[in-house]
Amino acid sequence: MHLADLIETTLSGMGYELVELERAPAGLLRVYIDQPETGIAIEDCEKVSRQLTHVFTVENVDYERLEVSSPGLDRPLKKLADYVRFAGEEARVTLRLPVNGQKNFTGILREPTGAAGEEKIGLEFEGKDGPALLEFAVSDVDKARLVPVIDFKGNQRKGNKQ
């Protein structure tokens, strides 16, 4: 079984989702997890770390060190479900190919529309001539992240504990 599949299967059985997996030099394995309903606390990271350590031993996974973390305030957007969950939030999107000479966009995500497998995501942004709407598919994205919203008064971003 592929490492990402092994981790994803383990996490889904525990009620978490795999956001990102990184293999860093010197055997470091970084796993970013989330729980859509509640977000991630340090106790969640500890629990997942213990479980993955056990699974990796049983499955004979080669690694030196394991780090388990929340995706952070600037959470990456990887799957269609991420765009659905964070519709209405501000995001920074870099496309694989330029649209009108531009690859980088920052704006408000709109919920995906269209038939299954052909969904288009909307991003409202400030264009050269005023407000504009960019429509793109998940496959058009090189990378996308939420724009961190830091509110020192204690209000939280929808769907997150962070």
From Swiss-Prot:
It comes from the Bacteria. The keyword Repeat does not apply. The keyword Cytoplasm applies. Keywords: Cytoplasm, Ribosome biogenesis. Gene3D superfamilies: Ribosome maturation factor RimP, C-terminal domain, RimP-like superfamily, N-terminal. Pfam families: DUF150_C, RimP_N. Disulfide bonds: none annotated. One of its GO terms (biological process) is translation. GO terms for cellular component: cytosol. SUPFAM superfamilies: YhbC-like, C-terminal domain, YhbC-like, N-terminal domain. It is found in: Cytoplasm. CDD domains: YlxS_C. HAMAP family: RimP (MF_01077). Belongs to the RimP family. Required for maturation of 30S ribosomal subunits. This is Ribosome maturation factor RimP.
